[in-house]
Amino acid sequence: MFHMLKIRLIPCIVTKGELVVQSFAFKNYLPIGNVKTAIDFFVNWDVDEIIVNDIDASKEFREPNVDLVSWAAKECFVPLTVGGGIKTLEHIRNLLKAGADKVTINTKAIDDPDFIKNAASVFGSQCITVSVDAIKQGNVYKLYDYRDGRVLDVDVVDWVRKVESYGAGEILLNSVDRDGSREGYDVELLKTVSGIVSIPVIALGGIGRFDQLAEGAIEGGCQALSAANIFQHMEHSTIAAKAQMRNAKLNVRLSSKVKYENFDLDFLGRPY
């Protein structure tokens, strides 16, 4: 299916409050700047969507930052997905009213899977993304709860089937093992999940070079490709990413203002 549809490029801005961080194995975090600056950077470049995910909101029992979303919606000319601290339907309503196009739910879905049903019923599946953090245990992938670093006794295969049946519109699939590793996506994980659900899967976790992106679609079967750390420390990063996706013959949305053939990569995977 991936080759028939345009493959989306979606930077993921990982935050602790309004501080953007780089994440490494879900354990170590490097602060790198302000979330408003990061959003400003991406809206001026070649992306299809933006995800802003506050990873501390649920841990710290904070509500979603509606004021930030309201500001971002005025700046953003691409769809905006927001996650972090979502516990009630009112939270979702407020975020959508503030200008978010979609929300991503993680720990609330773990605690109360029926919340997915209720949210999809009220707001529509197209607004509801479920974020799934997967970690490999032996030969199977288990669900990971980042709040306390627990590996849950829940098979990811069973979980994504349930998530889909409960009305999620898409899945944001993140590999705990690959997070910050720069080793590329966990293609086996992506292939496993995309092969058993019919809703779109967004690949996340492990990108260290832009020429690694395409395997998420070609081998992993995903309809959207996301990354976090790599976009935060090099100029023209999203254009270089699209250039590599184009070179891999993926069907991507291209800007008429950009000459993609000028974006080659050096031996470290950086554009030059």
Curated annotation (Swiss-Prot):
Keyword Isomerase carried by entry: no
Top-level EC class as recorded in UniProt: lyase
Keywords: Amino-acid biosynthesis, Cytoplasm, Histidine biosynthesis, Lyase
GO molecular function: imidazoleglycerol-phosphate synthase activity; oxo-acid-lyase activity
Reaction equation(s) it catalyzes: 5-[(5-phospho-1-deoxy-D-ribulos-1-ylimino)methylamino]-1-(5-phospho-beta-D-ribosyl)imidazole-4-carboxamide + L-glutamine = D-erythro-1-(imidazol-4-yl)glycerol 3-phosphate + 5-amino-1-(5-phospho-beta-D-ribosyl)imidazole-4-carboxamide + L-glutamate + H(+)
Database matches in SUPFAM superfamilies: Ribulose-phoshate binding barrel
Active site: D133
Primary location recorded for the protein, binned into one broad class: cytoplasm
EC number: 4.3.2.10
NCBIfam families xref list: WbuZ
Known partners and oligomeric status: Heterodimer of HisH and HisF.
Function: IGPS catalyzes the conversion of PRFAR and glutamine to IGP, AICAR and glutamate. The HisF subunit catalyzes the cyclization activity that produces IGP and AICAR from PRFAR using the ammonia provided by the HisH subunit.
Family: Belongs to the HisA/HisF family.
Protein name as catalogued: Putative imidazole glycerol phosphate synthase subunit hisF2
Organism, scientific name: Vibrio vulnificus (strain YJ016)
Gene behind this protein: hisF2
